[in-house]
Amino acid sequence: MMIHIPKVLTPEQVARCRAVMDAAGWVDGRSTAGAQAVHVKKNLQLPDGSAEARELGEMVRAALQRSALFTSAVLPRRILPPMFNRYDAGMTFGSHVDNAIRFVRDSGEPLRTDVSTTLFLSEPDEYEGGELVVEDTYGAHKVKLPAGDAIVYPATSLHHVTPITRGSRVASFFWTQSLIRDAGQRALLFDMDMAIMRLNQDHPGHISAVQLTGVYHNLLRQWAEV
């Protein structure tokens, strides 16, 4: 299940991210790649743990906590500190699957990567190429969103970034360990949550909405890992 999360960051926050990144030093993105991804990854990243990455990462995490849609789609338990990358002309990231386990930067604590997120920080007309392509049983899905918007998708997905042919593309990317390990169960809960919200809008206080909310929370209680 891929979910588009619009307007995670405001235009002012995007501008702040761009200003910080424009003044920052970048390193080879292969420094954080896994054993297979290192052979197909060609991009730049803000140094993990740098002052710039920490400032922008806190901004992103605070914005995510305010996003009801992100919470409903992902049901986050723990979010790995956001990272930031840049693709210039000729850069790309070939097909790969994200590592199942990553480690929190400061504590070294392991985190299971259930959900991947890309938060776009460049406008689509600033670059050509650079689409995120996520593959599932229904085919390949190209994603290129306005600055400040995010896409979330199961971290089990095969995906790649097409080569940049003009301009530069900057983004934040990170992983979340969900309360719900199984992507199918997350999708069912998300669909139910959306249906409950629509029912509440159309028929405020209706007993069916109350009953469905109870079913939602009982399923969450049954499936959640806390």
Swiss-Prot record:
Binding site residues for Fe cation: H96, D98, H159
Cofactor note: Binds 1 Fe(2+) ion per subunit.
Stated name of the protein: PKHD-type hydroxylase AZC_3753
Keyword annotations from UniProtKB, A to Z: Dioxygenase, Iron, Metal-binding, Oxidoreductase, Vitamin C
EC number: 1.14.11.-
GO MF term set: 2-oxoglutarate-dependent dioxygenase activity; iron ion binding; L-ascorbic acid binding
GO biological process: DNA damage response; intracellular iron ion homeostasis
NCBIfam families from the UniProt entry: PRK05467.1-2, PRK05467.1-3, PRK05467.1-4
Cited SMART domains: P4Hc
Annotated ranges, domain Fe2OG dioxygenase: 78-178
Domain of life: Bacteria
UniProt enzyme class: oxidoreductase
Cofactor(s) recorded in Swiss-Prot or TrEMBL: Fe(2+); L-ascorbate
Stored InterPro entries: Oxoglu/Fe-dep_dioxygenase_dom, PKHD_C, PKHD_hydroxylase, Pro_4_hyd_alph, Pro_4_hyd_alph_FE2OG_OXY
Binding site for 2-oxoglutarate: R169
